[in-house]
Amino acid sequence: METNGKALSGYRFLTLLERPELKAAAASWFHEKWGVPDEAYLACMTAYLSGETEYGWYLCLDGERIVGGLGVIENDFHDRKDLAPNVCAVYTEEDCRCLGIAGRLLDLAVEDLRAKGVSPLYLVTDHVGFYERYGWEFFCPAQGDGEPEPTRLYIHR
């Protein structure tokens, strides 16, 4: 796949299980993007790497640089605790956007968890139109913890 002059095949897509030595760097990277404490990411990643949970962490590397990533957790800070697990912390570096990286990461997470018998997946977002391109459907509104307005909750079946 070639987009914006750079081949997507030039990037490496992987689970954190494939490169567990990236745990600290990945936690720091997600913290920089979302402001959630490193410790929260480290706890979730450690649970994944130790086999406590099948909910994974997925990265895109350009060489050794993390340029995209996302995680899967029980609940992404909203009131619909019955809708789990949730994709969280989806992010692609600005200089790598519009190449299909986030879509590939989303597909990787869906395929990985489906192979483990985990389906459907959910996510909360204010973006309209982006996730639909990758098979996600609007499911219902959800109230984010501490948020004044409801947000959109999507499902991938």
List the predicted regions and their residue ranges.
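Conserved N-terminal entry element of GNAT/NAT acetyltransferase domains
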Residues: 1-24, 157
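Helix-loop element at the rim of GNAT/NAT acetyltransferase active sites that forms part
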Residues: 20, 27-40
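Active-site rim helix/loop that mediates acceptor-substrate recognition in acyltransferases
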Residues: 34-61, 67
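Short hydrophobic/aromatic beta-strand or adjacent loop that forms the aromatic wall/cage
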Residues: 55, 148-154
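Conserved beta-strand in the GNAT
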Residues: 59, 65-75, 86, 91
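Conserved acetyl-CoA-binding loop-helix of GNAT-fold acetyltransferases
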Residues: 92, 98-111
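Conserved active-site alpha-helix within GNAT-family acetyltransferase domains
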Residues: 115-119, 125-150
